[in-house]
């Protein structure tokens, strides 16, 4: 449903410049005129705009709220607006819909997928459960609604260790989909009956241990902020354990944890191992700190599909709307609620 009328010539002209391609919508600059028009259209639609930490800077700047996916989904549920525009990847918008079933949830480009969420399907999970009857399924929030619906308890990167530790030690646990977060949980809990799915985020998996070690040795006074989805998380802990890098300078953190640490660090330089969009929020939080990417090529092409053109189109056309089957949503909601009952989930991812 369009929110334009005959007087909206500026929006009409801007939308007319939009072109579509397999990599996303283009043709509109994220300038001050665009930002003002986005805010005006959001008000007309009665919408609140949420942006993930990995979004383009101009998308983060125009959003009403910026954060990790679970925190944003909880904000969506509490927001007075009836329409949620979720600037992130598709599973994140699904999670917002699960927690806000009566609201309209829009994503600026429904093609914005996620390699990690796509690494396990409902069929995969059903087959895995059949191989391990009676096992407890723990799924990272970075999963589709259909996978959450087959899950016993969801977890975030902040509370994954606590969630697994809360489960009867005699019961098998199936942890999905991220193999690096799963390895971190196994290492921290010492749990031998924890089975880990071999999924990964292509961006985080590409931040390798050799790269991290080289950067760390070249910057001995820096702190390391390492996301547990990274393929280099084990290398970071190894560097600390071997004394190659001070243990108190190595921090395995969710995106929310990184922001908290940025506000308290005494370091003058921090090496950051996560998607490069996170640097924008970190630098805003602590401008006195020199935040540098361990790998400056670690950019998620799916996150960057949420362009200024895509957001403008979304607000004008009311597209793309996110739908989740009510039965799947109810089952997925229960798995998220069980996680919340165990304790505060902290940063989502």
From Swiss-Prot:
Entry binding sites for [4Fe-4S] cluster: 114, 201, 300
Binding-site positions, iminosuccinate: 52, 69, 140-142, 157, 227-229, 255
Cofactor: record remark: Binds 1 [4Fe-4S] cluster per subunit.
Lineage: superkingdom: Bacteria
Subcellular location(s) per record: Cytoplasm
A UniProt-annotated Pfam family: NadA
Keywords noted in UniProt: 4Fe-4S, Cytoplasm, Iron, Iron-sulfur, Metal-binding, Pyridine nucleotide biosynthesis, Transferase
GO biological process: 'de novo' NAD biosynthetic process from L-aspartate
Cofactor(s) the record lists: [4Fe-4S] cluster
Gene Ontology annotations for the cellular component aspect, listed alphabetically: cytosol
Record-linked InterPro entries: NadA, NadA_sf, Quinolinate_synth_type2
Coiled coil: none
Catalytic function, reaction form: iminosuccinate + dihydroxyacetone phosphate = quinolinate + phosphate + 2 H2O + H(+)
Main location group: cytoplasm
Pathway assignment: Cofactor biosynthesis; NAD(+) biosynthesis; quinolinate from iminoaspartate: step 1/1
EC number of the protein: 2.5.1.72
Entry GO MF terms: 4 iron, 4 sulfur cluster binding; metal ion binding; quinolinate synthetase A activity
Functional description taken from the UniProt entry: Catalyzes the condensation of iminoaspartate with dihydroxyacetone phosphate to form quinolinate.
Similarity field: Belongs to the quinolinate synthase family. Type 2 subfamily.
Alphabetized NCBIfam families for the sequence: nadA, PRK09375.1-2, PRK09375.1-4
Protein name: Quinolinate synthase
Organism: Mycobacterium avium (strain 104)
Lineage: Bacteria, Bacillati, Actinomycetota, Actinomycetes, Mycobacteriales
Gene: nadA
């Amino acid at each position: 449903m369009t929110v334009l009328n005959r007087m909206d010539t500026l929006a009409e002209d801007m939308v007319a410049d939009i072109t579509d391609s397999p990599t996303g919508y283009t043709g509109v600059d994220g300038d001050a005129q665009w930002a003002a028009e986005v805010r005006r259209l959001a008000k007309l639609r009665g919408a609140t705009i949420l942006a993930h930490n990995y979004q383009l800077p101009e998308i983060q700047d125009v959003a009403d709220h910026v954060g990790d996916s679970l925190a944003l989904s909880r904000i969506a549920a509490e927001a007075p607006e009836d329409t949620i525009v979720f600037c992130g990847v598709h599973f994140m918008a699904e999670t917002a819909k699960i927690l806000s079933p009566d609201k309209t949830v829009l994503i600026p480009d429904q093609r914005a997928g996620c390699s990690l969420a796509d690494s396990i399907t409902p069929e995969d999970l059903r087959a895995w459960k059949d191989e391990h009857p009676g096992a407890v399924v723990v799924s990272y929030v970075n999963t589709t609604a259909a996978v959450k619906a087959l899950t016993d308890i969801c977890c975030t990167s902040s509370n994954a260790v606590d969630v697994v530790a809360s489960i009867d030690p005699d019961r098998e646990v199936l942890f999905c989909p991220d193999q690096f977060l799963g390895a971190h949980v196994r290492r921290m809990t010492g749990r031998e009956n924890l089975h880990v799915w071999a999924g990964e985020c292509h961006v985080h998996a590409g931040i390798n241990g050799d790269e991290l070690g080289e950067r760390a040795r070249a910057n001995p006074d820096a702190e390391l902020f390492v996301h547990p989805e990274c393929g280099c998380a084990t290398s970071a802990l190894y560097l600390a354990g071997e004394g190659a890098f001070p243990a108190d300078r190595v921090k395995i953190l969710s995106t929310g944890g990184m922001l908290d640490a940025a506000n308290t660090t005494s370091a003058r330089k921090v090496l950051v191992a996560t998607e490069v969009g996170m640097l924008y929020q970190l630098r805003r939080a602590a401008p006195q700190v020199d935040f540098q990417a361990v790998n400056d090529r670690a950019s998620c092409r799916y996150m960057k599909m949420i362009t200024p053109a895509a957001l403008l189109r979304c607000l004008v056309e009311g597209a793309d709307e996110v739908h989740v089957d009510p039965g799947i949503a109810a089952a997925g909601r229960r798995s998220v609620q069980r996680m919340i009952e165990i304790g505060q989930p902290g940063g989502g991812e």
